[in-house]
Amino acid sequence: MSEAASQDVLYEVADHVATITINRPDVQNTISGPMLDALTERLLEADRDSDVRAIIITGTGRFFCAGLDLRTGNPGGGTGTERRVSVTLDLRSTPPTVLHNLDTPTICALNGSAAGYGMDLALGCDIRLMADNAKLAAAFTARGIVPESGGTWILPRLIGWSKAAELIFTGRTLLADECERLGLVSRVVPADTIGDAARALALEIAGQAPLAVQSSKRMMRMGMNETFDDHVHHVFLQLLPLFQTEDFREGMASFMQKRKAEFKGR
């Protein structure tokens, strides 16, 4: 990761919560080629860190992310529009694909508006909290392209085919209250409390048994594409190793003793 990219994608871990911050407020937090690699590295780093139990993704300033920064040219070197677009497209899918496959729960704190790739990045997170002054826009068809980063897969599953088609085909901008009504975000909070709200939720998740939370996420992901009978079978297979963990014993003991559990993640 380059020094510039590390400044554009900030990373910190505290109290079992990793926070990844897109930090280019002067260009509406648009994402450059090197930042795509940095985002991927940070997401994988957090997921592999046994101390991290929840991940927050947010932005600095008035925007969460206004999309990709195509003005920076070809991140892979060389010249020519076709080569530049080809390399950019190769890089675009990486962070959303990583997000989709992470076991660690992810929270998007939409501190500001998200458009295009920024919207897809937000949709890739498990939970979305949204500032009351933020907006969402697909904004792909107006640029002559498609939502290449998972939006066409996620949106119909979140809000149904008809509404997803309307949003993708028109690129219409949504205000925060409509995003909440449609189920695109879990809740809308005052803009000046978005960071605190996301952290409070992350800490609440981090207080649960981490192996159980991760297994629950895997089961939810698998359940999107399998029958009920297959899913129940896979849930049973997840339960067997959980019964052998220290956290299971601690969870049972804390319940019987009417005290707060102290989970170790093992």
What are these regions (language model features)?
Residues 25, 129-134, 185-246, 262-266:
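C-terminal long alpha-helix characteristic of the crotonase
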Residues 37, 59-98, 114, 142-144, ...:
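Glycine- (often His-adjacent) and acidic-residue-rich active-site loop
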Residues 172-178:
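Acidic, divalent-metal-coordinating active-site segment for phosphoryl/phosphodiester hydrolysis
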Residues 1-7, 253-266:
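Terminal low-complexity tails and localization/encapsulation signals of metabolic enzymes
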Residues 1-60:
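Conserved CoA-thioester-binding segment of acyl-CoA-metabolizing enzymes
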